[in-house]
Curated annotation (Swiss-Prot):
Protein name as catalogued: EKC/KEOPS complex subunit Tprkb
Primary localisation category: cytoplasm
Keyword Cytoplasm: yes
Protein location: Cytoplasm, Cytosol; Nucleus
An annotated GO cellular component: nucleus
The keyword Iron belongs to this UniProt entry's keyword annotation: no
Length: 158
């Protein structure tokens, strides 16, 4: 149902990915994330082709966090920002973060040593169905990926 990966460069850190579909409260989740009451990144699953994208973005975010050189204020936002091919934070949040209309949401959180995330509490806030991460290809919309990443059709393949 989920993917949890220990980061090679930071073995004390684990990244967990949770995928949801048929989400009915994306607007509420977004609001909670902006208030800081959700401990994780809320990502538009329609624009993610492979979980590896998330792991790369999370690894970079943790690295910059440890160096004190993040470009955003929170680790969760830094992960979303690192998914973007450009350097505009607000544009990255619009394209890769969730919006009120999203029905597929990927939640990503980082646990660092003693800092644990209460996954049950996080999952209970989502009004939708948690699905295995292997379902991501069915959720990905390649037309949206091409649009947000400014790619040509032949550049996006599975």
């Amino acid at each position: 149902m989920q993917l949890t990966q220990q980061l090679d460069l930071f073995p004390e850190c684990k990244v967990t990915l949770l995928l949801f579909k048929d989400v009915k409260n994306a607007g509420d989740l977004r609001k909670k994330a902006m208030e800081g009451s959700i401990d994780g990144s809320l990502i538009n699953a329609n624009v993610i082709v492979d979980p590896f994208q998330i792991l790369v973005a999370a690894n970079k975010a943790v690295h910059l966090h440890k160096l004190g050189k993040m470009k955003t204020r929170t680790l969760s936002t830094e992960i979303i920002f690192n998914l973007s091919p450009n350097n505009n934070i607000s544009e990255a949040l619009k394209k890769f973060g969730i919006s009120e209309s999203n029905t597929s949401v990927l939640i990503v959180y980082v646990e660092d040593g003693d800092k644990q995330v209460h996954q049950e509490h996080l999952v209970s806030q989502v009004e939708g169905q948690q699905v295995p991460l292997e379902s991501l290809p069915e959720i990905t919309r390649l037309s949206e990926v091409r649009k947000v990443c400014s790619t040509q059709p032949e550049e996006v393949s599975r």
